[in-house]
Amino acid sequence: MTIKLIVGLGNPGKNYKYHRHNVGFWFCDALAKLYAGNFKKRTKFFGEVTQINIFNHKIQLLKPTTFMNCSGQSIQSIANFYQINADEILIVHDELNINPGIAKIKSGGSHGGHNGLKNTIKILETKAFYRLRIGIGHPGNKLPIVDFVLNTPSKDELDKIQNALNNSLQVIEDVIKNNLDKVIKTLQKKEII
């Protein structure tokens, strides 16, 4: 397996830019900057796309512009066009059940209530893609989930989320090389609670 497509989940537009639900977009923006990518709107892919090279591997970066709950349409269109299999896709998304400051990677699994993943699984008809889960924490009983994810994190939470994103960027080359055991261990060592 070699990752050929990295998708950051989020909602398009200025109103959503700094919301917790957009950490996937934040990751893709930072990765594009790191590898000299320049996002362009591609209507046939229902998103913004750029191509980067990591270790001579061409990798498509995608930020769907379909809004979170319809992300699968965008992912399917680019995967079909470039003939990318599900196990060659890494989806980066916010994760309620992980504390801010923590990032985890895994293959497969359920959508865990995440509507972007739920739609992607439905459209692709598989769970066999990789996920980079960026912890945003859970509001508990303080706030409805939708209000929590569609809101900006506190300064402390933002610092921790940014740290998890930076740690994830540092291991992306190992992700591309398929050194997932190393990635898992490295991310565990860098957890900030």
Swiss-Prot record:
Residues carrying the site annotation Stabilizes the basic form of H active site to accept a proton: 94
Principal localisation: cytoplasm
Residue numbers marked as site, Discriminates between blocked and unblocked aminoacyl-tRNA: 11
UniProt cross-references to InterPro entries, sorted A to Z: Pept_tRNA_hydro, Pept_tRNA_hydro_CS, Pept_tRNA_hydro_sf
Catalytic activity: an N-acyl-L-alpha-aminoacyl-tRNA + H2O = an N-acyl-L-amino acid + a tRNA + H(+)
Keywords attached to this entry: Cytoplasm, Hydrolase, RNA-binding, tRNA-binding
A cellular component annotation (GO) from this entry: cytoplasm
GO-annotated molecular function: peptidyl-tRNA hydrolase activity; tRNA binding
GO biological process terms on file: protein quality control for misfolded or incompletely synthesized proteins; rescue of stalled ribosome
Active site (record annotation): 21 (proton acceptor)
Enzyme class at the top of the EC tree: hydrolase
Compartments where found: Cytoplasm
Residues involved in tRNA binding: 16, 67, 69, 115
Pfam family, one: Pept_tRNA_hydro
Record EC number: 3.1.1.29
Family of this protein: Belongs to the PTH family.
Subunit structure comment from the entry: Monomer.
Entries under NCBIfam families matching the protein: pth
Role played: Hydrolyzes ribosome-free peptidyl-tRNAs (with 1 or more amino acids incorporated), which drop off the ribosome during protein synthesis, or as a result of ribosome stalling. Catalyzes the release of premature peptidyl moieties from peptidyl-tRNA molecules trapped in stalled 50S ribosomal subunits, and thus maintains levels of free tRNAs and 50S ribosomes.
Protein name as it appears in the record: Peptidyl-tRNA hydrolase
Gene name for this UniProt entry: pth
